[in-house]
Amino acid sequence: MHCTVKMTEDLYWVGASDRRLALFESVYPIPRGVSYNAYVLLDEKTVLLDTVDQSVAGQFFENLAHVLGGRPLDYIVVHHMEPDHAKTLEETVRRYPEAKIICNAKIRDMIRNYFTFDIDARAILMAEGDTYCFGKHTFAYVMAPMVHWPEVMVSYDLTTRTLFSADAFGTFGAINGALFADEVDFFRDYVDEARRYYLSLIHISEPTR
């Protein structure tokens, strides 16, 4: 059964939470689980921003199909190649074979090594400061290497001033139906896990100055 959240007039959360996983990346204890965040933009073109880990693939594909409502998927934006963002990318391409993939050159090269589909036939490459228009919404792309892998980029919706930030502001912890800041007490519910996430994953990958 689908479980989605309408974020704005035309943006939907289609991710999922995993409360069964004991260790994130087989290293970090996650007693409160973890969430995988993916979004769909329904503009003149349809856009999927990231996929999810294989562990929640069933929920994700139900969510995606529900939000698309029979529309084709035109674009997939890949911000980061870690499995919690991209493990289901190949299956998404199989289900939506006409979708183009918006990424950068490093992500394209990693896709060549990780997956079997022809990325070169569908890749639209972004570099620092490039923009892409989907209709009402225009996205700008900013490279964010080592946050926390070398290929990472982020998307900024110039229309709504929304940042899709990959892992930059991540935290451990499953989402219990609340996605907006005024629905949670961040300092009570998330700040400790956000600090642990930053110190475990982001801080250790910062480039040496």
Task: Describe every region a protein language model picked out.
Residues 47-50, 74-78, 140-141:
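Short catalytic-loop micro-motif centered on adjacent basic/acidic residues
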Residues 140-174:
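Internal, well-ordered alpha/beta segment that forms a basic, Gly-enriched binding/recognition surface
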Residues 4-66, 154-157, 162-165:
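Conserved beta-strand hairpin/beta-sheet module of binuclear metal-dependent hydrolase folds
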Residues 21, 81-86, 108-111, 148-150, ...:
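Active-site environment of divalent metal-dependent phosphoester hydrolases
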Residues 202-209:
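Residue-level detector of conserved catalytic or cofactor/ligand-binding positions
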Residues 44, 55-102:
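Active-site metal-binding motif and surrounding structural segment of the metallo-beta-lactamase
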Residues 5-9, 102-152:
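Metallo-beta-lactamase
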Residues 172-198:
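Active-site gating loops and adjacent loop-to-helix segments of metal-dependent hydrolytic enzymes
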